[in-house]
Amino acid sequence: MALRSVMFSDVSIDFSPEEWEYLDLEQKDLYRDVMLENYSNLVSLGCFISKPDVISSLEQGKEPWKVVRKGRRQYPDLETKYETKKLSLENDIYEINLSQWKIMERIENHGLKGLILKNDWESTGKIEGQERPQEGYFSSVKMPSEKVSSYQKRTSVTPHQRLHFVDKPYECKECGKAFRVRQQLTFHHRIHTGEKPYECKECGMAFRQTAHLTRHQRLHSGEKLYECKECGEAFICGADLRVHQKMHIGEKPYECKECGKAFRVRGQLTLHQRIHTGEKPYVCKECGKAFRQYAHLTRHQKLNSADRLYECKECGKAFLCGSGLRVHHKLHTGEKPYECKECGKAFRVRQQLTLHQRIHTGEKPYECKECGKTFSRGYHLILHHRIHTGEKPYECKECWKAFSRYSQLISHQSIHIGVKPYDCKECGKAFRLLSQLTQHQSIHIGEKPYKCKECGKAFRLRQKLTLHQSIHTGEKPFECKECRKAFRLNSSLIQHLRIHSGEKPYECKECKKAFRQHSHLTHHLKIHNVKI
């Protein structure tokens, strides 16, 4: 059987600096994994070579193309000599140049690494009759001719089609997820073991991969190499810049087939799809609670351990994640870099601006499938949906009263402790919530910023305007499931439901008579001459 050597570059991928910058983070990590795995395979097959510079750089999280340029300056003659030379000592044997880095394929071709089968290879450190090049710079591997033919046949198809040829032989025993490259499995397995071998010397934060540590260290150094030519905003890594640039062109190429929502990044779509599937792959080993995103699990674990890594040097407030600290720090600096072009209002966070702009555009992309009502924010739809389901996940441990919103629970709990920390400087009235104080202060200044376009009536609160507008539209979104009677207000529905249930939660302490509505109790107390 004739043996044919296959070049290392035949199953490797290479990019120019410009091409490298257009790879996203996931693709760069995959590239790094494939190259390290290929090198590991060659070593295990008996290729006695010193570690190439590019492999050392990849292990350290460095950019590979920098090493490529350096290597070509050092050995230009060797590379020219051995790049295309065909040896005729045996039938069709070619020299393998492990540091050649010839640009052959795009990232979609990474799956060809799976064609390397250990049993099919024989290694040789020297071709008979050839003077051995510089130590560690070249090596060759022989492969049966039929395997080379198989390789050549597969390279004749499109890059996308090649992905379907490649299996995923490396399977995680914990969750069953499979990978094309062993190194990917190694990285993935650290999610289950919690192993984070790469530690930041500045803050002690640890990471599973060196590339992640490298990006993190730029937070400390303030290094932002990638600047947007449109708006001048700078980023730590190129992937963040490319995602940002899609905002300017409005590109959202990744669309959810379930609901049609589109995303700029494939990873965002993957996370979003778990809402539809209900998948929560990340489980807390302490309490068993599951999460859709690993970042959510990490934050949850920090809450349990009271481990708060990010502390504000101005006020000492601590945060679970660095992004929270960065947003908070803008409070001290007064920085609000994101300005609305319609009204000039500025925001500390880009997402706040995006949500605000929907006020001007009228965009409400989130629709309730039960009643057809639409919302500008996904969270508002979630809260609204609880009206239909009756879900009240937040329970007071003092009186066991349940609430559909966490903010309602917090507000309610202050009743038990009697705390009203927010005082009005005008009249001295105290409130449990800052939002209540803000609403109250508009009474003193006479501000009513929310005006009805139908009749011109103005309101202090947007919520009041929304309720008022239902008078003009005739909308009654809150329906009783018992008798199908509909109401404009949720509070009216709650009161109505007590007719069916017989519930009378408001009791007179004087005579023990009970009432369905608080206003009825107030009116009744006048009989006893009780001051309210």
UniProtKB/Swiss-Prot annotation:
Compartment annotation: Nucleus
- A GO CC annotation given for this chain: nucleus
Q: What SMART domains does its record include? A: KRAB, ZnF_C2H2
Chief subcellular site?
Answer: nucleus
According to the UniProt entry, the cross-link of type Glycyl lysine isopeptide (Lys-Gly) (interchain with G-Cter in SUMO2) is at 126, 142
Under the heading InterPro entries, the entry gives: KRAB, KRAB_dom_sf, Znf_C2H2_sf, Znf_C2H2_type
What terms describe the molecular function in GO for this protein?
DNA-binding transcription factor activity, RNA polymerase II-specific; RNA polymerase II cis-regulatory region sequence-specific DNA binding; zinc ion binding
Which stretches does the record call C2H2-type zinc fingers? 170-192, 198-220, 226-248, 254-276, 282-304, 310-332, 338-360, 366-388, 394-416, 422-444, 450-472, 478-500, 506-528
Which Pfam families does the annotation name?
KRAB, zf-C2H2
| Keywords, comma-separated and alphabetical | DNA-binding, Isopeptide bond, Metal-binding, Nucleus, Repeat, Transcription, Transcription regulation, Ubl conjugation, Zinc, Zinc-finger
Q: Where in this chain does the record put each KRAB domain?
A: 6-77
GO biological processes? regulation of transcription by RNA polymerase II
Q: Which family does it belong to?
A: Belongs to the krueppel C2H2-type zinc-finger protein family.
> What is the role of the protein in this entry?
May be involved in transcriptional regulation.
Q: What is this protein called?
A: Zinc finger protein 82 homolog
Source organism of the structure: Homo sapiens (Human)
Q: Which gene encodes it?
A: ZFP82
